[in-house]
């Protein structure tokens, strides 16, 4: 009795479960981190936006800076929608901030891309988020459990959120490797050769999970295994930027 096919099928199912679990960790970590950062900032971000959006360059830099700080362009967009609806800001003032926010959100992608670094050099290995995320998690847990200051507890939550996020990214990358060798999986990915379909897939997944960073994390996991080429990934990224607009529409 040949059990190799059945064993391979079971492994593929477990890889799919791991991919979904990794995505859940990623989304939860991103949520914990961004909400803790927003809580630390309090109402300062709104006041800062009111004061510094008269100059387009300042607006651009402010949008990029705040998005890098809170690690969520969606949260930034929702904040701007609230300020415009309340009449505090005009629509024209938000253009520079949104452009800056789109620049700032790429920092998340750069951090995630460090997972793909391959080198025997110890210092290069230390740049990989999974190398230092356990230490970051430990620092975060110590701050949460053994400090009384709410600000320090929030910093601890940011650290733990980052560690959970990177754990999810590592899980997704590990799950994609066995799936990449599966003929059926490769066949599904061939639909991305069509740019229109690739844009729709990127927009659909991002709108569904409400996070362009998580959607990009999945894409980077596929790229690390060589499952998709740059030409296939580019329209998906365009779709992801369209899909992330759903947050603004819902708000």
Residue ranges and their predicted role:
Residues 85, 118, 139-154, 251:
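Membrane-water interface regions at transmembrane-helix termini and the short interhelical loops
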Residues 79-98, 109-131, 206-243, 251:
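Membrane-interfacial helix-loop connectors
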């Amino acid at each position: 009795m040949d059990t190799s096919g059945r064993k391979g099928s079971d492994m593929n199912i477990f890889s799919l479960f791991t991919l979904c679990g990794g995505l859940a960790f990623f989304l939860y970590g991103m949520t914990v981190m961004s909400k803790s950062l927003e809580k630390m900032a309090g109402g300062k971000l709104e006041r800062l936006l009111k004061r510094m959006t008269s100059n387009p360059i300042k607006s651009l830099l402010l949008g990029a800076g705040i998005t890098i700080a809170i690690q969520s362009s969606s949260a930034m967009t929702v904040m701007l929608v609230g300020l415009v609806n309340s009449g505090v800001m005009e629509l024209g003032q938000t253009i520079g901030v949104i452009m800056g926010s789109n620049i700032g959100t790429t920092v998340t992608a750069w951090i995630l891309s460090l997972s793909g670094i391959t080198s025997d050099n110890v210092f290069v290995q230390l740049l990989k988020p999974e190398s230092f995320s356990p230490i970051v998690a430990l620092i975060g847990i110590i701050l949460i459990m053994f400090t009384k200051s709410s600000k320090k507890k929030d910093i601890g939550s940011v650290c733990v959120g980052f560690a959970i996020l990177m754990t999810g990214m590592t899980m997704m990358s590990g799950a994609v490797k066995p799936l990449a060798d599966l003929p059926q999986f490769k066949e599904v990915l061939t639909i991305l050769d069509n740019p229109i379909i690739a844009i729709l897939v990127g927009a659909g997944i991002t709108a569904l999970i409400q996070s362009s960073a998580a959607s990009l994390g999945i894409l980077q996991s596929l790229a690390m295994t060589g499952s998709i080429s740059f030409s296939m990934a580019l329209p998906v990224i365009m779709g992801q930027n369209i899909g992330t607009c759903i947050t603004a529409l819902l708000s």
